[in-house]
Amino acid sequence: MCAVTVVPDPTCCGTLSFKVPKDAKKGKHLGTFDIRQAIMDYGGLHSQEWCAKGIVNPTFTVRMHAPRNAFAGLSIACTFDDYKRIDLPALGNECPPSEMFELPTKVFMLKDADVHEWQFNYGELTGHGLCNWANVATQPTLYFFVASTNQVTMAADWQCIVTMHVDMGPVIDRFELNPTMTWPIQLGDTFAIDRYYEAKEIKLDGSTSMLSISYNFGGPVKHSKKHAISYSRAVMSRNLGWSGTISGSVKSVSSLFCTASFVIFPWECEAPPTLRQVLWGPHQIMHGDGQFEIAIKTRLHSAATTEEGFGRLGILPLSGPIAPDAHVGSYEFIVHINTWRPDSQVHPPMFSSSELYNWFTLTNLKPDANTGVVNFDIPGYIHDFASKDATVTLASNPLSWLVAATGWHYGEVDLCISWSRSKQAQAQEGSVSITTNYRDWGAYWQGQARIYDLRRTEAEIPIFLGSYAGATPSGALGKQNYVRISIVNAKDIVALRVCLRPKSIKFWGRSATLF
């Protein structure tokens, strides 16, 4: 009796097919996979189980079926976006790798396998369970795109198939899972940077120029089309500097026709080192693909988190590249920095953890022409505040970056409000009313209500950040609590500043904001 070789795969929960151009160019958007919709459309056991449980914490396995080809010199990436942070039209309907790499991503090299896999736990990336109904805050989506231009043009466009597989896991009894980060930020023995860098190239001209990746791992960064702040950059920007060891991997994305070897090393200066300087220090010689672990080496044993020029991961060509006469492409490779392991060096925070963090400043207030009063409503979530009744200047700091780089937040803060006036105190008239509210203003669902003389110039009031779902995104989710600031005789206000004093805040989800 013959063994059964063709069996159904009970883990499959959805499929996607897309065409790859024969001359695929870096940044080409190939396909979009809506995870929730795909499971519902595919139907079957998983859809029924999901409906029965309501909310789950599944483990997904993405399988990209692309025939192994060592000659194409092509890589395809898959980026996961749970919070609708990728706006393809705003990116020119392309997927520029540097911007996409700010979000959780896996890069597949065609030379490596016939079936390329990426397994991830949904809750670990997002911080919450997967609900079986659509909502305004989340839309788990995979974007497939060309990560590096293929070096050899194929005979024709070709089809690629993606299958999604799932283990729904046990039923869970809450939406929010363990927070991804809490404030004040505390790092453990290791921190997952999990960041790919756009393909580097060693040209076929005998050049031995040094390549590098800057150690400024924190704060917003400018890419080809957008600025970006990712989760790892937000977390690392908490401190002025960092030191320790980074580990990662290097993968060749070149055609098999082209090979080379190079050395990876820590370097501080702008000028490239001699080979002797490299070999005297910590280094790792790479022959194609491989893992690396490199300790930072700078004059002061530390690198500035948000500044260029205080350290870099150097890459120096050694041997090659070697390629046939007809080959025109460079030797290309992609660096992935996976983990940072801090050492015992002490680094101060950018700002004190108990200090105030400026949220926004209002100038050019526009009071009502008849009453002279202007109102500002500040909701119970941190976001890019806007108002038609004033000029708004948003502040930028590690707290605002962490909000932008995650999906949900929850906690308690003090709103610290201060203002400057145009008149001397003895001549100043007017007042500032500050109230905590819920629902529409006319319903008068109020908590605290205080009136301050305009001459006082400052006030504080606590507010909870959250929603009916517990945590809140950076946007309205149903009716939310809010603070209303009402200013009588507002024409005398030169500027009004709103700061946050964090008491305890939790954050969920590894993401990024492109702006």
Curated annotation (Swiss-Prot):
Keywords: Capsid protein, Virion. It comes from Tobacco ringspot virus (TobRV). GO terms for molecular function: structural molecule activity. It holds the Pfam family Nepo_coat_C. The virus coat is formed of 60 copies of the coat protein. It is found in: Virion. Residues 1-2 form a propeptide. This is Capsid protein. Its main location: virion. InterPro entries: Nepo_coat, Nepo_coat_C, Nepo_coat_N, Viral_coat. GO terms for cellular component: viral capsid.
